[in-house]
Amino acid sequence: MKWKDWVHVTKLDPDKQLGPGDIDAIAASGTDALMLSGTLNVTKENLLALQKMIAQYDLPLVMEPAGPEAVLMEGIEYVFVPSVLNTTDVQWIVGKHRSWVQQQDGKIPWDMVVPEAYIVLNPASSVGRVTKAVCDLKPAEVAAYTEVADRYFHFPIVYIEYSGTYGAPAVVKAAAEAIDHAILYYGGGINSAEKAAEMGKYADTIVVGNAVYDQGASVLKATVDAVQ
């Protein structure tokens, strides 16, 4: 299955702890892919430790780097690289990307790289604070960012990120109506089948992360079943 066909992705944070039984249950949940992603305290060491825990399972593995200093590429199917469109700091749009390219010095396997246009909408989240995102956006403004990402910059993914809180379905609906070519991702606060189904009406792909750590793999499976 290609990444464009995924409907459910599980986001795993290298700064959080999972037991072997948790990994078994996540792998058996029916999720389409596993994403290694975090905002704080992400290092190559804890990324490698998490990768080792999940390497035995036959699931696509995505690296979503928080910055150029910790990016895995070996044993990874795709590297999803975010650009935060609604930030006041150009580092999060293109600056860190330039640093990564310079550091790699021609070694980036570009056929693995999938650019993401992030629209971050939770000001209390780590990603919102770190990236200095302007989060108080109306649905029409989110739709406009989505159209810019899709039609002007040609990002293959537009990612509506509420990170830790459940977002407004009207906002995701507005983004869905504005999009033409890109795949629409939604992440944030999905911890039940009902929420998964609601956001799954508008987003092509839902991402579940915190619920895995807070409520366990049974909730994860319920979110998978709601969209598949």
UniProtKB/Swiss-Prot annotation:
NCBIfam families: GGGP-family, GGGPS_Afulg, PRK04169.1-3
Binding site for Mg(2+): 13, 39
Binding site for sn-glycerol 1-phosphate: 11, 159-164, 189, 209-210
Gene Ontology molecular function: magnesium ion binding; phosphoglycerol geranylgeranyltransferase activity
Catalysis: reaction(s): sn-glycerol 1-phosphate + (2E,6E,10E)-geranylgeranyl diphosphate = sn-3-O-(geranylgeranyl)glycerol 1-phosphate + diphosphate
Any one biological process term the GO annotation gives: glycerophospholipid biosynthetic process
Compartment(s) of residence: Cytoplasm
Gene3D superfamilies, alphabetized: FMN-linked oxidoreductases
Keywords in alphabetical order: Cytoplasm, Lipid biosynthesis, Lipid metabolism, Magnesium, Metal-binding, Phospholipid biosynthesis, Phospholipid metabolism, Transferase
Full protein name: Geranylgeranylglyceryl phosphate synthase
EC code(s) of this entry: 2.5.1.41
Cofactor (UniProt): Mg(2+)
Entry function: Prenyltransferase that catalyzes the transfer of the geranylgeranyl moiety of geranylgeranyl diphosphate (GGPP) to the C3 hydroxyl of sn-glycerol-1-phosphate (G1P). This reaction is the first ether-bond-formation step in the biosynthesis of archaeal membrane lipids.
Pfam families: PcrB
CC terms in the record's Gene Ontology section: cytoplasm
Pathway: Membrane lipid metabolism; glycerophospholipid metabolism
Similarity annotation: Belongs to the GGGP/HepGP synthase family. Group I subfamily.
